[in-house]
Swiss-Prot record:
Protein name stated in the entry: Aquaporin TIP1-2
Keyword Repeat: no
Species whose genome carries this gene: Musa acuminata (Banana)
PROSITE patterns, sorted: MIP (PS00221)
Membrane-topology descriptor: Multi-pass membrane protein
Keywords, sorted A to Z: Membrane, Stress response, Transmembrane, Transmembrane helix, Transport, Vacuole
Pfam families the UniProt entry points to: MIP (PF00230)
Motif segment (NPA 1): 85-87
Membrane is among the record's keywords: yes
Induction context: Induced by salt (NaCl). Triggered by drought.
Homology family: Belongs to the MIP/aquaporin (TC 1.A.8) family. TIP (TC 1.A.8.10) subfamily.
Length: 252
């Protein structure tokens, strides 16, 4: 990845109407995603007496998150790019597809969207607590970090291949479907070990509302490292300097 491709952003970008609209779109998309994903776990607990950690609960979480992410990415794609994830935004920044200023605003919007979604869930359920992400009893923090790195690598690599690559052509809804599928599959693979976050915003909202911060750093460090590796590999190897170009918001 050429260092010169990384953009800080113009001084007035933060207050530009397009940036504000894009940030609002990220807030709404993340709210939709977290409300459905976290809410599905709460509903499963209510119906099965805390059975969300069972195999059936894992499958339910996979389906809910996969479907919800497909929708969240689709509704935001034409406005903000439909990142719905600080790790995806970080990967896009490293590839020169989004400026630092816009990326920071996206992060703020995504984190706020997650917190508001969890607060709405607490209100709508009569005070039920959202469950913060945690490690299984036999999983170390470093096991979890590796899981998050590998799973987020797969997610961000998929984002690059289906949504960022200038040669992608007209894929229509293929990108949101592929992104939803990889998240659902990764939840089946890693959910029993560390919850399979792949998304710092998804972990942040429940942690704030339940005020549970045990090993929370894992769900930032792992996804950001995985996103960075995926962005550097795909942009450096498969896109390359010859085909690299700054993409408009609707194309990343």
């Amino acid at each position: 990845m050429p260092i010169g491709s990384i953009a800080i952003g113009a001084p007035g970008e933060a207050s530009h109407p397009d940036t504000i609209k894009a940030s609002l779109a990220e807030f709404i998309s993340t709210l939709i995603f977290v409300f459905a994903g976290e809410g599905s776990g709460m509903a499963f607990n209510k119906l099965t007496n805390d059975g969300s950690t069972t195999p059936a609960g894992l499958v339910a979480a996979s389906l809910a998150h996969g479907f919800a992410l497909f929708v969240a990415v689709s509704v935001g794609a034409n406005i903000s790019g439909g990142h719905v994830n600080p790790a995806v935004t970080f990967g896009a920044f490293l590839g020169g597809n989004i400026s630092l200023i816009r990326g920071i605003l996206y992060w703020i919007a995504q984190l706020l969207g997650s917190v508001v979604a969890c607060l709405l869930l607490k209100l709508a359920t009569g005070g039920l607590e959202t469950s913060a992400f945690s490690l299984s009893s036999d999983v170390s923090v470093w096991n979890a970090v590796v899981f998050e790195i590998v799973m987020t690598f797969g997610l961000v690599y998929t984002v690059y291949a289906t949504a960022v690559d200038p040669r992608k052509g007209d894929l229509g809804v293929i990108a949101p479907i592929a992104i939803g599928f990889i998240v659902g599959a990764n939840i089946l693979a890693g959910g029993a070990f560390d919850g399979a976050s792949m998304n710092p915003a998804v972990s942040f909202g429940p942690a704030v509302v339940s005020w549970t911060w045990d090993n929370h750093w894992v769900y930032w460090v792992g996804p950001l490292i995985g996103a960075a590796i995926a962005a550097l590999v795909y942009d450096g190897v498969f896109i390359g300097q010859a085909t690299h170009e700054q993409l408009p918001p609707s194309d990343y």
